[in-house]
């Protein structure tokens, strides 16, 4: 039996402030670091020993992975970083408060921007300092591939080739892998693995730093999936993510 653990990064500073983050490179909060450490401790207790790890170019995911591996005494394993696992690009919404944006545009519209399959926010202008074409970390990515905004459909289009050609290919010769990324890049992967419809994907909300295990047979057919943690606690965490656009 082969396993891949999907893990959304720990709480970031903009998660705490309830802002749209996207490709903005914000750090973890103290709570986020603690969440990552807890995830590592759980994975170690469950006996996981990863052969390789994957993460995005964004520090909230990179630092989460580093913390997890440190707690597991697996700092030495090979880690591969890729922009293709970055969060969905939220265009001009990046930096805005979700609840305040819902007050301005309506909760239904914000929910479509956050969770729908094929609706993207307005793109950031070419000369906007937030444009990834101005970021040195993407210097080896062609401008045509760098987004100014994305829907979940767009995010899947850049994530899935990497998932199929790199991660699943690696699983053929590995037993256990871990992928630490972001809510929407991981939602796209889960949509593929569980064959979730375009309509139903809107209802999937991933909590921060809760390990999500996928088991595969030797032919790489997915056989089982489950969160590590108390089911009621995981449910509450998922509901909290769903309610982020509501005024408190």
Swiss-Prot record:
Site for Transition state stabilizer, residues: 182
Top enzyme class: isomerase
EC number: 5.4.2.11
Keywords: Gluconeogenesis, Glycolysis, Isomerase
GO molecular function, one term: phosphoglycerate mutase activity
The keyword ATP-binding is annotated on this UniProt entry: no
GO biological process: gluconeogenesis; glycolytic process
Pfam families per the UniProt record, alphabetical: His_Phos_1
InterPro entries, A to Z: His_Pase_superF_clade-1 (IPR013078), His_PPase_superfam (IPR029033), PG/BPGM_mutase_AS (IPR001345), Phosphogly_mut1 (IPR005952)
Reaction(s) this enzyme catalyzes, per UniProt: (2R)-2-phosphoglycerate = (2R)-3-phosphoglycerate
Tagged with keyword Cell membrane: no
Record-listed substrate binding positions: 8-15, 21-22, 60, 87-90, 98, 114-115, 183-184
Pathway(s) of this molecule: Carbohydrate degradation; glycolysis; pyruvate from D-glyceraldehyde 3-phosphate: step 3/5
Active site: 9, 87
Domain of life: Bacteria
Entry similarity comment: Belongs to the phosphoglycerate mutase family. BPG-dependent PGAM subfamily.
General function of this protein: Catalyzes the interconversion of 2-phosphoglycerate and 3-phosphoglycerate.
Name of the molecule in the record: 2,3-bisphosphoglycerate-dependent phosphoglycerate mutase
The organism of origin for this protein: Elusimicrobium minutum (strain Pei191)
């Amino acid at each position: 039996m082969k396993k891949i653990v999907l893990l959304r990064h720990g709480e970031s500073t903009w998660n705490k402030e309830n802002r749209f983050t996207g490709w903005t490179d914000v750090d973890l909060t103290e709570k986020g670091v603690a969440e990552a450490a807890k995830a590592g401790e759980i994975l170690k207790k469950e006996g996981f020993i990863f052969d390789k790890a994957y993460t995005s170019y964004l520090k909230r995911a990179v630092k989460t992975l580093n913390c997890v591996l440190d707690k597991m005494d697996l700092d030495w394993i090979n880690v591969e970083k890729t922009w293709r696992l970055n969060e969905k690009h939220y265009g001009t919404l990046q930096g805005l408060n979700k609840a305040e944006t819902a007050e301005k545009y309506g909760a239904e519209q914000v929910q479509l921007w956050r969770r729908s399959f094929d609706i993207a926010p307005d793109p950031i202008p070419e000369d906007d300092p937030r444009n990834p074409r101005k970021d040195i970390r993407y210097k080896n990515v062609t401008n045509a591939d760098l987004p100014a905004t994305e829907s979940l459909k767009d995010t899947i289009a850049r994530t899935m080739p990497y998932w199929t050609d790199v991660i699943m290919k690696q699983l053929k010769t590995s037993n256990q892998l871990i992928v630490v990324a972001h809510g929407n890049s991981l939602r796209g992967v889960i949509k593929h693995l569980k064959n979730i419809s375009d309509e139903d994907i809107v209802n999937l909300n991933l909590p921060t730093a809760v390990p999500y295990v996928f088991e595969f047979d030797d032919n790489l057919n997915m056989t089982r999936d489950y969160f590590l943690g108390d089911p009621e606690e995981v449910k509450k965490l998922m509901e909290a993510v769903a309610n982020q656009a509501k005024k408190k």
